[in-house]
């Protein structure tokens, strides 16, 4: 189904002039971000005009809008989600920090009963984390052990438990001393004074090698793994409430999944949302006026700059346009040649031309659009400020034209070809 566009009404009047000025300003800003070659000093975009020739549109499909069109704006949504996460994060840390300041031998410590020997049933590390399940693992990252490739699976637990349990109360020391967990947590080697030191500010010294941490009577006993990690502070200092290392609070576990705010928030689909896919062919007189300054290197580098005026007087275009209506938004973009062929198939006229006039030496599946892009042709005129005998005296004019046209193509491809798109509020 073909439709006719009232081009004059759509591109004239105050709204048409405002849209043309926005397009001119947009292209001008893009040129200011381009790295210019040595022989060009600046590129300025002065005017843009839609011309008088309308495009030829042929509707190919009505369908549901692409999922990318339902993504919320990152600037607005990310800030809201970040504030929620920061608030929840702060409340959880405040609660955990206050709980950890309590003595480790208080009666209110929540533990899963009954406690089991971690070496039963194939030594699964998950039951060992039961005394610390109320803690967020974000604040207690797992750490590898130097000298052991890949680390060990239970090091993180032993490091965490040192801040809240002392001496043989730690699972490692209890197992090494032959005390089963089912009989309770014993503390026959340390008195109440030592227990107090384990949860106070002096708990930071547990990262150092201390003879008290080793049970010399048992050959299977070993030093606390925290003493072997001087360059990576353990979680025991955080558990004890020691604030001398605030930077440790921001360490992340590499195994942790990404935070939710990194995923885009999607708008809700509605039955009235729709999308139109149409083939757009254009061979019109759209105009774009640019100026550039060419640098002359004689008799010295960048000796003088001469103005060069470039006028784009027409464009030949062939591609598939996508217009999606979602609530009060209209999203507009073009599809690349590969995406267009996959979604709506190749153009019938192009297929007939390919069958009637096969191109020797070329891949029969390669279309002209893939070779030249969506902009098939750009007509340009150049005006030089100085001429001699009707001939241009500047040698870099052709280079400047090719550079400017290449940038026009690049801006079009990057800004208007899906997944890039423009959104209009209506």
Swiss-Prot record:
GO terms for molecular function: lipid binding. Residues 1-426 form the SMP-LTD domain. GO terms for biological process: mitochondrial genome maintenance; mitochondrion-endoplasmic reticulum membrane tethering; phospholipid transport; protein insertion into mitochondrial outer membrane. Keywords: Endoplasmic reticulum, Lipid transport, Lipid-binding, Membrane, Mitochondrion, Mitochondrion outer membrane, Transport. It is a peripheral membrane protein. Residues 216-236 have a biased composition (Low complexity). Belongs to the MDM12 family. Component of the ERMES/MDM complex, which serves as a molecular tether to connect the endoplasmic reticulum (ER) and mitochondria. Components of this complex are involved in the control of mitochondrial shape and protein biogenesis, and function in nonvesicular lipid trafficking between the ER and mitochondria. Mdm12 is required for the interaction of the ER-resident membrane protein mmm1 and the outer mitochondrial membrane-resident beta-barrel protein mdm10. This is Mitochondrial distribution and morphology protein 12. It comes from Aspergillus terreus (strain NIH 2624 / FGSC A1156).
């Amino acid at each position: 189904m073909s439709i006719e566009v009232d081009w004059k009404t759509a591109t004239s009047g105050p709204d048409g002039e405002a849209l043309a000025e926005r397009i001119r300003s947009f292209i001008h800003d893009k040129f200011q971000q381009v790295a210019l070659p040595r022989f060009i000093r600046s590129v300025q975009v002065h005017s843009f005009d839609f011309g008088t020739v309308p495009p030829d549109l042929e509707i190919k499909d009505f369908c549901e809008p692409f999922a990318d069109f339902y993504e919320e704006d990152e600037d607005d949504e990310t800030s809201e989600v970040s504030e929620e996460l920061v608030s929840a994060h702060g409340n959880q840390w405040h609660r955990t920090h206050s709980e950890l300041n309590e003595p480790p031998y208080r009666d209110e410590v929540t533990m899963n009963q009954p406690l089991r020997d971690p070496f039963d049933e194939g030594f699964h590390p998950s039951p060992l984390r039961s005394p610390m399940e109320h803690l967020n693992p974000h604040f207690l990252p797992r750490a590898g052990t130097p000298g052991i490739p890949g680390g060990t699976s239970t090091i993180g637990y032993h490091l965490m438990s040192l801040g809240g349990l002392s001496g043989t109360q730690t699972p490692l020391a209890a197992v090494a001393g032959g005390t089963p967990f089912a009989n309770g947590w014993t503390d026959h080697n340390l008195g109440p004074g030592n227990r107090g030191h384990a949860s106070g500010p002096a708990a930071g010294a547990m990262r150092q090698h201390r003879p008290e941490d080793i049970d010399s009577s048992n050959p299977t006993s070993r030093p606390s793994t925290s003493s072997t990690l001087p360059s990576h502070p353990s979680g025991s200092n955080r558990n004890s409430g020691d604030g001398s290392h605030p930077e440790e609070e921001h360490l992340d576990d590499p195994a942790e999944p990404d935070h939710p705010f990194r995923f885009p928030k999607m708008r809700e689909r509605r039955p009235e949302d729709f999308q139109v896919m149409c083939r757009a062919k254009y061979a019109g007189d759209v105009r774009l006026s640019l100026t550039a300054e060419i640098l002359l290197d004689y008799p010295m580098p960048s000796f003088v700059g001469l103005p060069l005026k470039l006028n784009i007087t027409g464009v030949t275009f062939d591609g598939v346009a996508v217009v999606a209506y979602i609530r009060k938004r209209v999203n507009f973009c073009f599809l690349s040649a590969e995406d267009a062929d996959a979604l709506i198939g190749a153009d019938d006229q192009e297929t007939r031309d390919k069958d009637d006039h096969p191109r020797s030496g070329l891949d029969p599946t390669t279309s002209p659009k893939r070779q030249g892009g969506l902009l098939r042709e750009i007509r340009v005129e150049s005006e030089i400020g100085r001429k001699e005998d009707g001939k241009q005296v500047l040698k870099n004019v052709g280079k400047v034209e090719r550079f400017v046209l290449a940038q026009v193509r690049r801006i079009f491809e990057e800004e208007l070809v899906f997944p890039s798109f423009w959104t209009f509020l209506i």
